[in-house]
Amino acid sequence: MASSSSPERGLEALRDTDESEGEAPGPSGPRGRGGPSGAGSALRLRSLEAEMAAACVTSTAGEDLGTFSEPGSQHGDPEGGGGPDLELGHARPMMRSQRELGLTPKGGGKADQGGKGRKGGSGSPPHTKSSRKREQPNPNRSLMAQGAAGPPLPGARGSPAMPQPESSLSPRPDQSHHFDFPVGNLEAPGPTLRSSTSQGSGSTPVPEALRCAESSRAESDQSSPAGRELRQQASPRAPDDDDDGDGGPDPRGSGTPEGWVLRSGVVPFGRRSSASEVSPEEVRPEAQCTGWNLRPRPRSSASAVSPEARPKAQSAGRNLRPRPRSSASVVSPEARPKAQSAGRNLRPRPRSSASVVSPEARPEAQSAGRNLRPRATPRVPVAPSSTTRSSSDRGSSRAPRSRSRSRSCSTPRLGSDHQRSRKIKMRLDLQVDREPESEAEQEEQELESEPGPSSRPQASRSSSRFAVPGRSSLAAEDSPPRRPVRMRASSPSPPGRLYPLPKHYFEGVHSPSSSSSESSSVSSSHSPLNKAPDPGSSPPLSSLSGPNPFWLALIADLDNLDSSSPRVPGEEIEAAPHTREEEDKKCRG
């Protein structure tokens, strides 16, 4: 306390000098600043002026004055120990109070300059005096806001780790009573800001402080367009505060030309505009530009992103995603309609890692998810779809999917395709032997009974010709429930298997469906070689020697499948052995 009090007294003397100079913002700013450069301090003074104009806009809203001494106090922390936090926290409530007092831009500018003087390295007393002179309507509030903001700043300078309220109170009993008001005024963001800034030296707790301050500000400012303007202007201020309060040491390293660019950009708005002229739109483009410039400073840039900036911030602010918390927390109630409509994109960004699927994102995620789900789920059905590709129903419905998938999954299906091709050959031989339906049904049922493409190649190779009768008979026993499968097989060629088959089969591909023909055409070059060593002598013969004349004849038979009538499972079972033999004969011959 004592350690902070002596520097505070020195700062008070500086404040007196700076107060007189505060009305000449240029000299007071550079002198009081002792910042990186006179130009930087001049920019800060301009930013303070812009903030004053913003506060004047808020004064049009007619809320309390307390906010006002804050901009100065915000920037008043050259060492930035807790400056930005205090600035942000106090800036908004004090802007409210200033609105209540209805300060004129002129008075606001003077008070701001007083704040500049104080910022210039002096505490709030000169600002207190200037505020008393200019803001007579509510000197207590100005004092209280200054007492809340100004003294803690010297405290932050002298002993940043010290609880700043007490340090400021001890050197300045005259303003100590004002701390009660700022506590009430600041609605807990003030004290929390002080404690957080004093403890964390203003670096980490700032987002939380911003949230508290913005929540309180949002509560007070929700109804008023000036509230929005304050939000945007205070949010640009937040960057300014970061640079101004932190300007010297700037724990965040935010004392960068970016911040000053921000200030110079904000300044034109403040100077150009009378109190009401500073429209949210004007400041928002500014905030957008500043937000982009301020990306290195996530909280300030995200806070700078105003409701209107946020839609753009969403499109462009996907850059802001790294700043989820601030963008989410900064979304004030007014901003939330916009932020909800567009900001649902923002909110998933805060939650993005956990619950990116926001209401709006969900349609996209659902549409994309539907894309994913068809990809995912049909990949599961890939086995049945590929198995039943010979069926027209599933073949027609799944053919497009399975085609795309078969391209990707063609490698596991190659075996299944060749197995299918053999079975098609079987079917065609059976159809040549008056039993097209029975064996086709058996084949399909066998394919369906087989668990998946991976097992299918194995089954086709291991039991390619010899297990077929048994399997076909078993599947044929199941055929009555599988009659739908037979129906699918009964009319495959037009819908299910759109036979570009001659090309593909002449290429050596033996896929029953166009999709499988595509996937197998991918592998057509290797397929004869890969499948040649299959256990049955017929597969290599059929794949290497047989395909062209064999499939020419059998494709016509496949086309005849539509007209062919389904067979009884008993016939199918009977048909299986000799048809297999005939198939082997034909494939070999």
Curated annotation (Swiss-Prot):
Looking at the keywords, is Cell wall biogenesis/degradation present? no
The keyword Ribonucleoprotein belongs to this UniProt entry's keyword annotation: no
In the record, which positions carry Phosphoserine?
306
Q: Where is the composition biased (Polar residues)?
A: 193-204
Compositionally biased intervals (Gly residues): 29-38, 105-114
Q: One MF term from GO for this chain?
A: protein-containing complex binding
Q: Where is the composition biased (Basic and acidic residues)?
A: 426-437, 575-589
Q: From start to end residue, where is composition biased (Low complexity)?
A: 147-161, 299-308, 325-334, 351-360, 374-390, 450-465, 509-547
Q: What happens when the gene is disrupted?
A: No overt developmental defects with mutant adults appearing indistinguishable from wild-type. Two-fold increase in H3K27me2 and H3K27me3 levels in germ cells in testis but males display normal testis-to-body weight ratio and normal fertility. Increased H3K27me3 levels in postnatal oocytes and slight increase in the number of oocytes with lagging chromosomes. No significant differences in the number of primordial, primary and secondary/antral follicles of pre-pubertal females but older females show a reduced number of follicles at 16 weeks.
Question: What compartments host this protein?
Answer: Nucleus; Cytoplasm
Q: Which residues lie within the region annotated Necessary and sufficient for inhibition of PRC2/EED-EZH1 and PRC2/EED-EZH2 complex activity? A: 484-503
Expression across tissues is: Highly expressed in ovary with lower expression in testis and very low levels in other tissues tested including prostate, brain, kidney, spleen and liver. During spermatogenesis, expressed mainly in spermatogonia with very low expression in spermatocytes I and II.
Could you tell me which InterPro entries the record lists for this protein?
Answer: EZH_Inhibitor
Residue numbers spanned by region Disordered: 1-46, 61-548, 561-589
GO cellular component terms given for this protein: cytoplasm; nucleus
Provide a GO biological process annotation: chromatin organization
Task: Report the domain of life of the source organism.
Answer: Eukaryota
Residue spans with biased composition (Acidic residues)? 438-449
Sufficient for interaction with EZH2 as annotated region, ranges:
482-490
* UniProt keyword annotations, A-Z: Cytoplasm, Nucleus, Phosphoprotein
**Which PANTHER family does the record match to this protein?**
EZH INHIBITORY PROTEIN, EZH INHIBITORY PROTEIN-RELATED
Cited function: Inhibits PRC2/EED-EZH1 and PRC2/EED-EZH2 complex function by inhibiting EZH1/EZH2 methyltransferase activity, thereby causing down-regulation of histone H3 trimethylation at 'Lys-27' (H3K27me3). Probably inhibits methyltransferase activity by limiting the stimulatory effect of cofactors such as AEBP2 and JARID2. Inhibits H3K27me3 deposition during spermatogenesis and oogenesis.
Quaternary structure note: Interacts with PRC2/EED-EZH1 complex member EZH1 and with PRC2/EED-EZH2 complex member EZH2; the interaction blocks EZH1/EZH2 methyltransferase activity. Interacts (via C-terminus) with SUZ12 which is a member of the PRC2/EED-EZH1 and PRC2/EED-EZH2 complexes.
Q: Which protein, by its recorded name, is this?
A: EZH inhibitory protein
